[in-house]
Amino acid sequence: MMQVIRCEHPEGLRALHGLAEIEHPSGDTAASLWYDLPTPYHDGWYYILDEEVCAAPPERLGTWFPEWVRPLLRKQGFRFVTLEVPEQALCHVGKYQVVIKRELCVERGEYLQ
């Protein structure tokens, strides 16, 4: 089993629309937060992220959400939940992305602060 983290918002991934480049306060790093819309996370795919793993729809993979992005997203209403994912659920594994099958996830309900 692999532990990953899902980014959630009441409006689904549509809430990410308009978030383009978010710069780190130091100015050293930026994260591109683009997704193909309108593809909500409840369409059979989960959109998972942690410091090195981010899930996106198979037609267009998403980008990395490093730890410093999370407080910025929380201010905009996002929250994060941990999931346990079996290896057979992995459809694609990239350097910063992973695509998994929703029905094979086990939600632990551990929301991060």
Model-found features: residue ranges?
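Active-site-proximal loop/hinge segments that shape catalytic or ion-binding/gating pockets
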Residues: E87, H92-Q113
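ADP-ribose/NAD+-binding catalytic cleft of ART/PARP-like enzymes
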Residues: M1-L49, G62, E67-R74, V81-H92
